[in-house]
């Protein structure tokens, strides 16, 4: 059980991870949490916890520094731990920050826009951010962020995901599972994760092909067969008889049919043994957002209960709820900051505020509005509405501002030049060659 001393120490550890402009940055964290009605970056400075002028929020993001290694260590120190007999579920996904008209912002790449009307161009430009979180026991925004990094133009989201897994892998408890969306359907990622002490559960695309073990040599002339019969996700004629089949109930008590095939491989990595899982939900509407049939790939211990693993994939959707909370409530994509480095610092501020609210949810006394149910679990937005009283009890490690008088301003005759323009980076980086980890 988390108490006020734990949250107070968390605040001091976060403060220590700011090497420069730490007071302004920490004031920004408190202001972001305690101003639930704000709709822009300047508006959060009207919080009582932002002790500086409103322009200092931009100065802090421009001049401040955040030690990402120290911040990751703090996040992992306070991350939720699984109960005895339970697993730790880790989610990794990428989210885009659209900046189509920010020509003075560097390193913008193409982003895919979802849920658009037919005929609309589904491409915009901006930055990608890769986020690694601890998933909640049920899909909700109560995710705990472990790491959040910008995907630069010279790398890919898949490479960033592998790097994030390797950074945290040595700290993970046994039987931990990393859950990935269909965008991470990549043989290279499976090869890189095969030597790690963590299971990987990913969703598959319809075009993915697998092969069963090769038959024994026939003794005839020529090279023996390297692959067995084909299993193509989009072709039911290739399924044959699965190695196992079970009927289970999901978290809402609805029937789910699970089938699996073991000891499969892909042509690019025949040495890598994979399990393919088919999940059929008869109650689904069978639309693009709610498919009736889903296919998963499992890379990990073959002795694990496949049905439990397959049902656990639904926890991944909690990360989508977390993204929605960060963007709609914590204003993650609202500030129009010029440089990617400034927006990286803002992204870390949002991650700190998100985790702080999660740690403080059991310590906050929330005044519910008449239409809000007291029988439901408290949301992070409701925690924000009652965080002020807790912040008074915890105090702040940030030092008060020192008045310095008025600035001298620009020197006489100074020339303000036009900001540098940067083109959109369209070059797609190449994934390294497949090598066993």
Enumerate the predicted regions with their spans.
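N-terminal cationic-hydrophobic initiation segments that often serve targeting/anchoring roles
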Residues: 33, 45, 80, 169-170
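Active-site-proximal, Lys/Arg-enriched surface segment
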Residues: 60-139
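Gly/serine-rich nucleotide phosphate-binding loop at the start of the catalytic core
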Residues: 1-64, 69-70, 75
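A common structural microfeature
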Residues: 29, 38-41, 54, 85-91, ...
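Single, function-defining residue in the core of a domain
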Residues: 1-21, 25, 30, 37, ...
């Amino acid at each position: 059980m988390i108490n006020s001393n734990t949250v107070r120490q968390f605040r001091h550890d976060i403060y220590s991870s700011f090497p420069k402009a730490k007071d302004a940055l920490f004031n920004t964290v408190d202001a972001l949490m305690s101003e639930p009605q704000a709709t822009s970056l300047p508006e959060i400075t009207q919080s009582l916890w932002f002790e500086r002028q409103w322009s200092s929020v931009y100065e802090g993001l421009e001049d401040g520094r955040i030690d990402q290694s120290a911040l990751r260590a703090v996040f992992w120190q306070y991350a939720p731990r699984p109960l005895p007999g339970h697993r730790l579920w880790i989610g990794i996904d990428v989210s885009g920050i659209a900046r189509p008209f920010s020509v003075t912002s560097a390193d913008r790449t193409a982003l895919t826009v979802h849920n658009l009307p037919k005929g609309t161009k589904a491409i915009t430009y901006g930055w990608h951010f890769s986020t690694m979180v601890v998933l909640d026991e049920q899909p909700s925004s109560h995710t705990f962020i472990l790491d959040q990094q910008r995907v630069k133009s010279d790398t890919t989201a898949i490479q960033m995901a592998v790097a994030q897994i390797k950074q945290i892998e040595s700290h993970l408890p046994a039987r931990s599972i990393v859950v990935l969306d269909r965008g991470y359907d990549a043989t290279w990622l499976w090869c890189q994760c095969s030597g790690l002490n963590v299971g990987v559960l990913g969703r598959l695309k319809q075009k993915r092909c697998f092969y069963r073990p090769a038959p024994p040599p026939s003794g005839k002339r020529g090279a023996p067969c390297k692959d067995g019969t084909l299993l193509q996700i989009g072709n039911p004629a290739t399924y044959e008889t699965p190695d196992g089949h079970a009927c289970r109930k999901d978290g809402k008590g609805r029937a789910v049919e699970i089938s699996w095939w073991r000891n499969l491989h892909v042509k690019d990595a025949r040495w890598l043994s994979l399990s393919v899982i088919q999940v059929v939900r008869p109650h689904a509407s069978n639309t693009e957002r709610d498919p009736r049939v889903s296919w998963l790939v499992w890379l990990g211990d073959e002795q694990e209960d496949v049905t439990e693993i397959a049902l656990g994939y639904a926890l991944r959707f909690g990360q989508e709820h977390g993204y929605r909370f960060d963007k709609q409530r914590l204003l993650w994509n609202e500030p129009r900051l010029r440089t990617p480095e400034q927006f990286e610092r803002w992204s870390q501020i949002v991650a700190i505020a998100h985790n702080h609210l999660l740690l403080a949810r059991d310590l906050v006394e929330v005044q519910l509005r008449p239409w809000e149910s007291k029988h439901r679990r408290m949301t992070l937005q409701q925690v924000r509405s009652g965080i002020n009283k807790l912040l008074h009890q915890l105090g702040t490690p940030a030092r008060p501002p020192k008045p310095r008088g008025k600035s001298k301003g620009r020197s006489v005759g100074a020339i303000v030049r036009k900001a540098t323009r940067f083109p959109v980076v369209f070059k797609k980086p190449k994934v390294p060659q497949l090598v066993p980890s």
